[in-house]
Amino acid sequence: MIIAIDGPSGAGKSTVSKAVARRLGFSCLDTGAMYRSIAWQALQDGVSLEDGEALGRIADMHEIGFSHEPGDPLPRRVSIAGADVTDAIRTAEIDRSVSAVAAAPAVRQALVAQQQRIGRAGNYVVEGRDIGTAVFPEAELKVFLTASAAERAHRRVAQNERRGVGSTDYAEVLADIERRDAIDSSRDTSPLKPAPDAVQMDSTGRTIEQIIERICALAQEKGMHV
């Protein structure tokens, strides 16, 4: 079974997806981490972020790995080419780079194939930008989660402060979110938009717990539990 959670940067997808997966006994797949990993590898290799074909070759060559920390049922460590990039892919540099990588059709083709192989192996909450529209259009439950750009910027700053990575300058983070929204929504391949049958949720002014409870209730209505 698949629960697809889509939405723009900073909407709370990661926090919500992990909590929903934990409560339902599902695993969780962060597809954004996969695109970030390709961006990181491209920068390491000196590949231009405007060279879509070269970016696609990187995605074709490398399987993105996810691993568990002791005692944690959800995969949290991310690796590519044998390197643990869990923290490295959360920097401001990757924030600025990932939308260009995700817009490359060859990258999306390669990573969507990886995502489908992973998700079809079990019960997953899958988060990203195009899960309900392109990766798993057959998902049993689709959610499109959003919030105002200002709200998302505040959340991202707080998240970066907790992690100790990424920018903590509100104006810089807000500008980056607005830039990424424009790129993600206007790209030719799998633009950011809700699936026709997605449940749309605006989390502005609502607690993350309220969103989690709503999604879990919808999942249980559909008999989605282990």
Task: Tell me what each language-model feature is.
Residues 13:
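Conserved lysine of the Walker
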Residues 86-162:
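ATP-dependent NMP and nucleoside kinases share a basic, alpha-helical "lid"
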Residues 9:
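The conserved Walker
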Residues 16:
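Hydrophobic positions on the alpha1 helix immediately C-terminal to the Walker A/P-loop
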Residues 22-90:
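N-terminal phosphate/diphosphate-binding loop that engages ATP/GTP or pyrophosphate donors
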Residues 149-157, 161, 170, 174, ...:
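An amphipathic alpha-helix signature
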Residues 3-5:
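Hydrophobic anchor at the beta1->P-loop junction of P-loop NTPases
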Residues 79-86, 157-162, 182-226:
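NTP-dependent small-molecule kinase module
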